[in-house]
């Protein structure tokens, strides 16, 4: 099922996320890719344990938990922290399937990933 939830973040939250990410230090996105799709991933990613990723991840998680449509559709028990990706100069992530099992970095345990989400922080005309 694909579910579109417009305006998950408030304008202030969105602007804060964008401002923070514009000053972030990005690394190779392959660090979180499984073996099968490593050759497909050509992007940059914020380090999962960076202060920016932790702060912005909490903002997104709080917004998702407060959104009745998201909450009723996903019924989340546990959230994995969001991954923040940046695509520049032809960057892409080819056809792939997200990992079904991932390690939660703060809980240090492996979890099934039954629901996958993408939160766009830029307007479509900026791609």
Regions found by a protein language model. Give the residues of each.
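Catalytic core of non-heme Fe(II) oxygenases with the double-stranded beta-helix
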Residues: 68-127
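Non-heme Fe(II)/2-oxoglutarate
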Residues: 1-83
């Amino acid at each position: 099922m694909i579910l579109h939830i417009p305006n998950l973040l408030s304008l202030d939250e969105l602007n804060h996320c964008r401002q923070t990410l514009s000053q972030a230090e990005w690394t190779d996105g392959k660090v979180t890719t499984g073996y099968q799709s490593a050759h497909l991933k050509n992007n940059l990613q914020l380090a999962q344990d960076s202060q920016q990723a932790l702060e912005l991840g909490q903002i997104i998680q709080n917004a998702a938990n407060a959104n009745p449509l998201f909450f009723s559709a996903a019924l989340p028990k546990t959230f994995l922290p969001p991954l923040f990706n940046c695509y520049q100069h032809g960057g892409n992530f080819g056809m792939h399937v997200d990992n079904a099992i991932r390690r939660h970095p703060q809980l240090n345990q492996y979890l099934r990933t039954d629901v996958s989400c993408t939160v766009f922080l830029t307007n479509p005309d900026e791609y």
